[in-house]
Amino acid sequence: MAGQNRNKDFLIVSKDILPEAILKTAQAKELLVKGDANTINEAVDRVQLSRSAFYKYKDGVFPFYEASREKIITFSLTLENTAGVLSNVLNTIARFKANVLTINQGIPLQGIANVTISVENMGMVDIPENLLSALGEIDGVRKIEVIGQN
């Protein structure tokens, strides 16, 4: 199989539904990246994971922010149709220094506006997870979800 082009497909999955071995693999990798563990043995011991499980999953699991570095992230927001809500969303994106590529907003119906925003995260000062969390905390943002990235 050497020489064959292997395209990998990725999914965005809530970590709540992942098996424990995959979660612990991600934790062990994070310990190694942050320098909190010096060796793989130390990392897997700290998270109570077998080395074989670590090696099985290490190339297929990584945090959302790592998968989305230098990417375009598209998310859908459900906003209350109140003055200033969209402005607060855009100001939050600007604070994170994400580059807004597109904004699509439907006509508000029954006090709710659906907005789709695509951002380029190459110059961001923080990880995309924290941007999404900050957007979700804005008064008037009822729902936010990632609908794509490339």
Swiss-Prot record:
In terms of CDD domains, this protein maps to: ACT_PheB-BS
Domain annotation ACT: ranges: 74-149
Q: Which domain of life is it from?
A: Bacteria
- Which family would the database say this protein is a member of? Belongs to the UPF0735 family.
**Record-given protein name:** UPF0735 ACT domain-containing protein DSY2247
Annotated organism of origin = Desulfitobacterium hafniense (strain Y51)
Tell me the lineage of the source organism. Bacteria, Bacillati, Bacillota, Clostridia, Eubacteriales
